[in-house]
């Protein structure tokens, strides 16, 4: 598990970087989280766990509790469309979206260590890190 000291250190580093590198919050947070993951070890006895969460301004940052199978790094901004009902979409549009999802799935970074995935979030820009343990 991520210790309280490690959590505070990552939190402090994030706040420092947020102050001086405004446009790179998510990038730096991802780097530090991956670095933190490498240090941690995965407990085989663990079936499920919750990661410590920090709410930092308009971002919700979830830090992994152990070496993840992959990190789902989801980032959405105003460039993404608001969610629509499936019934309203045309067949061509659905096919195009499915193709985009497939491309995203194939673009795995560091052999499935970090996966960039788009989400529809029309309220605000959010940066979320989710971890899954490899058993």
Curated annotation (Swiss-Prot):
Subcellular location: Mitochondrion membrane
First and last residue of the signal peptide: none
Keyword list, A-Z: Meiosis, Membrane, Mitochondrion, Transmembrane, Transmembrane helix
Transmembrane segments: 20-39
Membrane topology: Single-pass membrane protein
Cellular component aspect of the GO annotation: mitochondrial membrane; mitochondrion
Positions of region (Disordered): 81-101
Task of the protein: Has a role in meiosis.
Name by which UniProt lists this protein: Meiotically up-regulated gene 116 protein
Species annotation: Schizosaccharomyces pombe (strain 972 / ATCC 24843)
Gene name of this polypeptide: mug116
